[in-house]
Structure formats: structure tokens, C-alpha cells
Amino acid sequence: MQKEKVWDKLSTDTEERMNAANELFSDRKVVPSQNGVALLEAVIRAGDRINLEGNNQKQADFLAECLGSCDSEKINNLHMVQSAVPLPIHLDIFDKGIAKKLDFAYGGPMAAKVAEFLREGKLELGAIHTYLELFARYFMDLTPRVSLICAYEGDKDGNLYTGFNTEDTPVIAEATKFRQGIVIAQVNKLVDKVQRVDIPGEWVDAVIESPKPFYLEPLFTRDPANITDTQVLMGMMALKGIYGEYGVQRLNHGIGFFTAAIELLLPTYGNELGLKGKICKHFALNPHPTMIPAIEDGWVESIHSFGGELGMQKYCEARPDIFFIGPDGSMRSNRAYSQTAGHYATDMFIGGTLQIDKYGNSSTATASRVAGFGGAPNMGCDAKGRRHVTDSWLKCGAEFEDQAALLGDMPRGKRLVVQMQETFKEKMDPSFVEKLDAWNLAKNANLDLAPVMIYSDDLTHIVTEEGIAYLAKCRGLEERMAAIRGVAGYTEVGLSADPKETKTLRERGIVKTPEDLGIDRSRANRSMLAAKSVKDLVDCSGGLYEPPARFVNW
Amino acid sequence: MQKEKVWDKLSTDTEERMNAANELFSDRKVVPSQNGVALLEAVIRAGDRINLEGNNQKQADFLAECLGSCDSEKINNLHMVQSAVPLPIHLDIFDKGIAKKLDFAYGGPMAAKVAEFLREGKLELGAIHTYLELFARYFMDLTPRVSLICAYEGDKDGNLYTGFNTEDTPVIAEATKFRQGIVIAQVNKLVDKVQRVDIPGEWVDAVIESPKPFYLEPLFTRDPANITDTQVLMGMMALKGIYGEYGVQRLNHGIGFFTAAIELLLPTYGNELGLKGKICKHFALNPHPTMIPAIEDGWVESIHSFGGELGMQKYCEARPDIFFIGPDGSMRSNRAYSQTAGHYATDMFIGGTLQIDKYGNSSTATASRVAGFGGAPNMGCDAKGRRHVTDSWLKCGAEFEDQAALLGDMPRGKRLVVQMQETFKEKMDPSFVEKLDAWNLAKNANLDLAPVMIYSDDLTHIVTEEGIAYLAKCRGLEERMAAIRGVAGYTEVGLSADPKETKTLRERGIVKTPEDLGIDRSRANRSMLAAKSVKDLVDCSGGLYEPPARFVNW
């Protein structure tokens, strides 16, 4: 027989750590903010796997500062597993040697710094994930030992109210606490009774009222004033040639001016095309201010959100038939569930990118920026586990020419995955390239694979100002490449197009120009937008939308 | 300007319904069980979308009986959205005209009845989903109006303890309650204070103590006494030729004797191959009793579970370093998160099927059974949104011959998706067929597509008693079909194999027989199993495993 085994090392260790922090508590689970650093130094060990909550919106910024102030002689070589690293402090923690390894999903403004630290050996990269994939690993091989989360309110028993910006908190807390880990929450306000229990108190070990409210980034706010005529044209093409053509009822919209334009075209051009009630009924979507006119015009039946959006809280609360509102009257977002909906329950993903290669692989990575792709790969892929049928999914599968080579005579649907991009971006950088810059990043950052946001075999349509390429209809890779060249304009890739070949593709409906789609270019301008400014959005909302100061110029 | 719009129809309607039920409550949120039918008649309206909790394990059976006892003159044409329909009452509800439409994931023992009702027009099928996909739609276009859920304990404020069998409850409750819906819970025991808050009281509208504990099915218990020598042989092949070959550390095991055999070979053959610490470290897995010897032998680092398994509760609680155990000392399962882990964080899915066609598409559907596939499509597919790299994923992608036709020169990994099946099943039904019976089901049940569990392009390996077919290594569909023929034995598909072609495939390592793998057939027998009976499993667990009576014969 084997020697007696110990099966509760984790809980014993947790108990020891919590005991070491005992005197830092002022009342039940409450720790005064001035004890924040001491608390982390008591419960964190060198080499620990640590989650620091923070996505592209809410940030456990006070706890991040506390972690950054820990003594790196004691606390070092941490393995950070966290959705995003958008704040300077996130990288400072590596700079100080407190953390060493990073598994994440989104770099945001710190993407260049991540690449720099990788080169300098200050940071070791685990992997770049899509959000839901990272959450998945919290229950597999990347469970956090200690998690630093954030909430609006907390009480002395640890109950948390995360409300509008619930975002990643439930999935982090559950994975950590149920593997004997330690969960520490910063809260904007310590209260006697939380407005609503979003996280049960038993899941939380310590609550700290932070000196100021957590940082929130209005990442999904696009000022209609900045939408260009070209974006209007492309939006009209997408609406008629894809949304209408496939009858897309359930979808996600990413960040960006292209989809903002589409949102603002629904009550105008969308109505003109007679599409209300036929498309855009259900969304997995952050509460985009540019959705207000379409919602007010009765287009939308439901929206489930990954996170909140600064300024949109009151508007969402006043539209409980549309958004997911709790019994207390405030919204609850949930990134894990919304990403799940985005993966399995939507018929289309549409968004922008930085570069598309001649095969149709696309990426926002550049040679010197470890950007990460957030939720895009999860929604911008063909969800192969999907089994339910919708008209648009079935239609795209039916026209997918290469399916027989994969499945024999077995039919299957296909999700619409659309990339919208002008052929040239600012500074005249071409969007279509022979080889993605991601290859150079892979070399520079010593990655196993070039970071691709959307792979060619998942991509079904490209929309540029030149036209739409219907890639699923192509026979084989060569034809797909020809279709891409056909909409790539004056880029190197586009210039290699054979006009005769493009003409044939147009005749077969694989490439469609605005004219092929019956769109009058002279109408494609900003006058088509249902709102032309942030002020228009506020008015349309009846004053419920409260834009952040940086968007207010009246 | 438009006329004044109403944006709170849902909450107004909910309030009206709850008011109608007002006098049925005895104390705060408590409704006596004899008022169960009256409660449902008060809060449910004809045509409602209703969730009735019940997966392949725990069942809200009392509430199902209550629903089945409602007056079909009042309550009819319900649209049921529920994970599974394994109980007779689930179909009775349709028989009585109370429900009309069904969206689900798993039929289990009622699969034939579902097909029958479809033919007779008693039931209209929305779609067959994989679990996570159905959950996804709860946040998109299939949000329940009323959900009938179940828990071990509930208190007067609606707080629920769902513990070991938390399973689907959190995702159902959140989707329903936050879209202004009504959540009714049956509990085994009404208590003053629940052991642990799994569902906050505010998410629950009514709690009913059911007359008897909810039904639990020990679906994942396999008696080692019933494992055959052939299953041992195939298990040895899989361990050496796939688990060991690819170094599979993170995985799921489905239901069945093939994977039960593998679990029981880890402490014997697995150790002999020197694989401990190199494979099978992290699982998304129900607490299979046949995992006990491998856990005790130190193979496993973590297991996150979809649900509980009858008899395994004490064992799991005594192994908190392995399972996900809460602060109260009891386990919390979670199907939504475990399926997410199964989709995005595992390197391999392995399981059995009923039929594989000549192209490699497989299904458990037959002409007269609407079976559904539970979690299999979610885990038995290539997760295209995945971006993190592991050795096994990278290796399978590198040997995937057809990748260049899809992606050009862009490399990508590939998940291992393995089907294990003897070439003939009981009654000598061939496992390999020209055309799946699923085609006939599609015709009989008027489905848009034949229900396929795993599509050919996701399948990477087939293991039969003849050998392993390494499908990802094949060049094109024709060669993949030849490899399938090469392991299909004396089935019609297998008999059409060209021996010369199979020989070439063996030389190229695309087909490997036990001899090619260096496995001595004479050793492939039950003596290799680490436990040969349920009694052995109990002993190995130190008496912690308490098997259900039907498995106890000593």
C-alpha cells in the first residue's frame, strides 16, 4: 500500500494565508483600504497564479495599485491570468518583477509595452486567448490561486453588487473560490445591504472600499459625427448585400465606425429596404449609444451585454423589455454568457480588422504590438458545435462550395463571418497584404504561431468600398484569393487582380460592387444616418443617455 | 413624433402573474407543495416559453408533474426549452396538449417517443442543440418566460443550495430572472439557512418543498465487471497511439465502457508506458467512479464537473485538491462552465458513437429516435475560436494535411477528436455504414439537416479493434475514406477496402494495427484493469464511494 496521501493541501494553505491576514480585518470581511498592500502580501505567495480583474471596461485598479506596491522581495514571479492589460499599472507589475508570466486576451493601449517587455525578458507570455477561452482555462489548468475583483457595492459579509458592469466577475469568483482560492474585492462603496446580490458573500474572502470608484472605459462609444461617407456606403452595402440577403436576425456588432454606421442606418436605409422585423432582432452586444435610434424605432427585441457602457446605465434601465435587467431594476451584464451567446446563438459576426492577407486570414497584430483579439475569435469563427438551424446559417452553408471536400454528401450550415475594411487605412497603410505583420510579431515575440484574429476558412465575406466578396461561394483557395483581389482596390494584392477574372466573379455573384447591389453611390453620405452627433443620440434617448464629458461639446 | 412607447411590458405582465398567485404563498417566497399546480396555473400563460430543469442527472420532477397536472384548457401550446427529456412526464406534457414545441439537447430514453410524437403532430421540434448552445440561446432568442428549477435546499427568501448537482441551475435562473421572467424552485428541504448560497434569493420567486427528493440518474457509472477484453485492447491502443503519442494532458471523457476501460488502464498500462504526469492531468468530467484508481494513484491534478454522480459525493468532498469544492466543503458542479472548458480548454474529445459513414461523419441518431447529442458536439468539434497553444494541439495541426487548402501558408493547431467503436455492435449491427440512419430520421421527422454528432472535418482519429485511423494525416477526402475503410473490419465499408491501399496507409503511419503500435494482443484482457468490479472501486476509495443499490451485488 502507498503512504497516506494528503488531499487538502490547497485548503490548508489557504487557511494559513488567511490566518496571516487576520489582524488586517476591521469587521468581518472588511479590510480598510490602507491595509490593502499588507493584505496582498499576507495572502499571496511568490509564483502564485493571480487573477486581476479588468477587461476593456471596468478595472480593479485599486487592487492593481496595491499589488504593484507589494515588496517584490516577497511577492515575485507571479503568473497573471487576466482578461486584459490596458492600464500602465498592469505592466508596472511586471517591470517591478512582481509578476513574470502573462496569460491574457486583450492588450489594448499596452500592446506595444507587452511586446517590448517580451523582448526584454521582463514578461513571459503564456498565450493570447479569446475571453471565453481564457475563462474556460480557469476551470482547467489556469485556475487562479488568488483573485482581485471589483464591484460597485459590498457588505460586511462579502456580498457584492456588480450590476451594470458585472462583466467577468462571476466566472472569476466561481473558478477561484471553488478551487479553495482566495477572492478579494475592491468595492466603490461599503454598504449595510447591497442593492442586489450578484456574488454571494461566501464566495468572497475580503472586501475593501477603494479610495475612488473603479476606472471605466467608454470603449464602445462612437461619435456619429466621425462617421465618414465611405463608411455609410459600406454600411449600405452590408445591409443590403448581407444583412438583407441572408436575413440576419441574431448577431453581434464589434467596436468600430463601420458597425456604428450600420446601426444608424437601420432606421433610415433599413426601413427603406423593408427590413424591420426581418433582421437585427437579437443581439449579443454592449450597450452601444449608436444603437439608440434603432431601439427607439422598434427594431430590436433583445440585447444581452458583455459589459456596461459608460453613460448608458439609465437608458438601459428604462428599456427593460430589451436589456437584461434584474429585480432591483438595474442591468446585469455577463461576459461569459454573452460570449457564449455570441459563439453559439448568433448567425453573424461582423467587424473591422487591420490586415487581411491574400488567403483571407486577418489580424490586428503588428510587428511590435501584442494586441490580443478580445472576443473576436470566439464570435468570428464558424461554431462547429452548433446544431440548430436558422435560415441565414442554412443559406450560407448551402452556398459553401468547398463543403463536399470536407464532409462528402453531408450538408451543414455555416455562420456568416464578415470583415469590413477600407482598402487603405489612415496614413495610406494597405489593409490587404501579401503576408500579415503578425508573422513578424511571432518572430519578435517568439510565439509558436502568428496571432490570427480570423482564419480564412471561417471568413465568409469581405466588405470594402470596392464591393463585397462572397468567399463561401468560391471553389477552392485559388478562387477565394481571386475574389479577395477583386475587392482589394489599389493595394498590392488588389493590383494583382486579373480584370477578366474579376468580371467572371461578378457575373457569378461572387464579387458585387455597389452598382451590382443596386446602390446609388450619390446617396451614400452622412445624411443617411439616423443620428449625426452625440447630441442627436441624447435627444433620441429622451435625455436618458448621459455621455461621458469627452463626448460632450454642446 | 411617434406615440408613447411602453418599454416594460415584461415586468408589468410578470407582476400581474405574481399577483394572481399571491394567496398561494404561505410565508414570504414559500409555496406549499399542494399549491404547486395552482401556482403554475397562476403564473404560466398559454404559448409561454418554459424551461423545465432536468439534464441527464437531476430532474425538477415534482414541478414537471405539477405542469403535467395543469388544466390544458388554460395552459397549452407551451414552448419548452430544456436540456433533456428523459422522463415519461416530459412527453406526457405534450401528450396532454399542455406543451407544443420543444427545443432541447438530449432525448435519452424518450428519444423514440419524441420521434413518434413528431410524426403524430403532438410535438413540434424547434431544434436539437448541444447543451452550451441551448444555454447560449437563453440569452438570445430562447429566453424562458418561466423556469422550473430544482435544488437541495431553499430558504424563505429564495436562496438556494444546489451543491454537488448545481448543473444547469445558475444559467437558467440568470437568463430567466434578468429578462423579467419567473423562477420557481422545487427543493428537497426547506431550511432556515441554506448550507451555501448557490443561487441568490432575489433570483427566485417561489420555493416549494417537494414531497420527495428530486430524481437523480447515475448516468456516468460503469461497472468494471462489464468491460470486455476488446475494450481493453482498444483502450491500450488509444493510450499508446493517441494519449501518449500526442501527450494529451487536458481532456474530457464521455459516457461509455471504452473510456471507462482507459480510466482503469491508467494505473496499470499507463504507468508501464511511463505516462504518469505526462497525460490526463486536467479533466472536464463528471465524477466517474472508474476514475477513482487513477486519482488515488496520483494521475489527476484537477477535475471540473458538469454535474454530480450518484454515490460520489463523499469521495469528491474528501478530495478537495482535485474537485471544485466550495467553502462549505461540498462540491459545486456547473454544466455551462464545464462545457465551456470542454470546448476551449481541452486538447482532446474521445467517445463512442453508433454509426460512422464512409466519409467520417458520425451520429447516434437512428431512423426512429430523436436522440440528441448532449455535450458531444460542443466538445467533439474543432474549437475554431481557440488561440492558445499546447503541444498536442500544435502537433495535430502540423500533421493536418489539408490545412493549406483552407488557410494558405498559415499554420494552426487542431483539436484531437477521437471516435472509438468496435466495427460491429450488439446484434451485429455494423458501426460503419454507407449512409447514416440520421438521413432517414431527417426525412421521418422533417428536419432541415440530418442530425450529425461529429462531422468528418472535425474528426481526427477512429479507433476500432482493427486499429487506429489517423485521419488528419490524410490528403483529401478520398484518402480519408480509404483510411476509414482500413479500420472498418468486415462491415460493408470495411470490405470495400483495397488491401494494397491499406498497406500503403500503414506504411505511412495513417493506419496502425495493434502490431504496428507494438501492442501484444495476448496481454489485452481484463487482468489489465486497475479495478475489476464496483466493489474494487469502493475499496480503492477507502469506502468513500457509495454506489447506488443497483450496482451493489456483494
UniProtKB/Swiss-Prot annotation, chains A, B:
Molecular function terms from GO: transferase activity
EC category name: transferase
Location in the cell: Cytoplasm
Entry keywords, A to Z: Cytoplasm, Transferase
GO cellular component, one term: cytoplasm
Listed NCBIfam families: mdcA
Main location per the UniProt record: cytoplasm
Top-level division of the source organism's lineage: Bacteria
pH dependence: Optimum pH is 5.5.
Function: Alpha subunit of the biotin-independent and biotin-dependent malonate decarboxylase multienzyme complex (EC 4.1.1.88 and EC 7.2.4.4, respectively). Acts as an acyl-carrier protein (ACP) transferase component. This first step in malonate decarboxylation involves the exchange of an acetyl thioester residue bound to the activated ACP subunit for a malonyl thioester residue. Has a weak activity with acetyl-CoA as substrate.
InterPro entries in alphabetical order: MadA (IPR005777), NagB/RpiA_transferase-like (IPR037171)
Protein name: Acetyl-S-ACP:malonate ACP transferase
Organism placement in taxonomy: Bacteria, Pseudomonadati, Thermodesulfobacteriota, Desulfuromonadia, Desulfuromonadales
Catalytic activity from the UniProt record: acetyl-[ACP] + malonate = malonyl-[ACP] + acetate
Enzyme Commission number: 2.3.1.187
